[in-house]
Amino acid sequence: LDSKNSLEDSVTAMESLIQQGVDGISVFPISTEQGSQLVKMANEAGIPVTIENFAMDGLDDPGDYIASVACEYDKIGEAAIKWIAEQDPEAKIFFCAGQEGAGVYEKYQEGVDRALEELGGDVKVVATLHADWLTDKAYNVTTDLINSGTEFNYIFANNDMMAQGCYNALKDAGKENIPIVSTGGSPDGFKMLQDGIEAANMTAPVSIQGVKTFMNLYNKVALGEDPAEKFTALPVIPVSADDTSSYIAWDDYAAAYKYLGENK
C-alpha cells in the first residue's frame, strides 16, 4: 500500500492491513518517528512487523520490530573518498554536496571527514559547495568554482542528478576529462557510467534492501526464525566505468538474492 509520504495515509494503510488480518507487515517509513508509530500499531494487533530504509535503534522506544535494513550514508561518503585516493593519492576533490539541514548530507560529510583523517592529508577536499540534489544548481556551483580558479582534479557528487550538472559544467569549460564519482547506483547512474559521464558510482542497491527486508519478514512469520542482527546496513559496492560487472540494478532481485547468499 502506498502511503504517498503522508503520515495520515500511512496510519490508514496500517489500519487496513490490521483489519485484513495479514500475517506480517513490512513498513517503509518516512521517518523513525513515523516508523515507531506504525510498529506500535502492529504490536497492539499482534502482527509481526519489519522496517526498511531507517535504523530504529536511535529511538528510546521504537516498538517491537523484527529488524531494520537501511543505507548508511556516512559509509558511502567514506567509500567515495577512499576510491578516489586509490586512483590518485594526492587528489584535489570538489565535493558537490546535497542540501544541508535534513541530515542526509551531514551523514555523508561524516564519512568524508573520516576518510580524509584516515588518509592523513595527501588527499584534500578543496571545496564543498551545496547543489541541494539539483542538476541545474550543480551546474552553477561547478561553473562558479571553475571560474574562481580553484584547482581540482576529481568531483564527488552527492547524487546522480548533481553528477550530470557537474559534467555539463565541465564539458562547457572544456574540462570533461575530470573524473566524477557519484552515489546511489540508480538506473540513470548506471547509464552515466556506460556513457563515461561518471568514473565510478558508490552503489547501495535498493534491491538488496528489499530482498533482505522480505527475508527478515518471511523467516519470522513462516519459519519462526529471528534474524542474526537487529540492523543490517546496505553494502556499499563501488562500480567503476571500466568494470560494471559488480553492478546490481535496483530491480534485479535475483542478483540481490544471490549477493546476500554469497555475503552472509
Locate predicted features.
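Hydrophobic alpha-helical segments within soluble ligand-binding/sensing domains
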Residues: S10, A67-I93, K107, K137-Y139, ...
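Short beta-strand elements in bilobed, periplasmic/extracellular small-molecule ligand-binding domains
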Residues: L1-S3, F94-F95, L116-T135
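Short beta-strand segments enriched in small/hydrophobic residues
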Residues: G24, P29, I66-A67, K92-G101
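Hydrophobic alpha-helical
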Residues: V11-E15, Q19, D23-E44, V112, ...
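Flexible loop/hinge segments that line or gate small-molecule binding clefts
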Residues: T32, Q37-K75, S186-Q194, A199, ...
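Hinge/cleft segment of the Venus flytrap/periplasmic-binding protein
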Residues: C96, E100, V104, A115-L119, ...
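Short, solvent-exposed amphipathic alpha-helices that sit
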Residues: I76-A80, G103-V123, K137, V141, ...
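Short secondary-structure boundary segments
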Residues: P29-I30, F54, A97, N159, ...
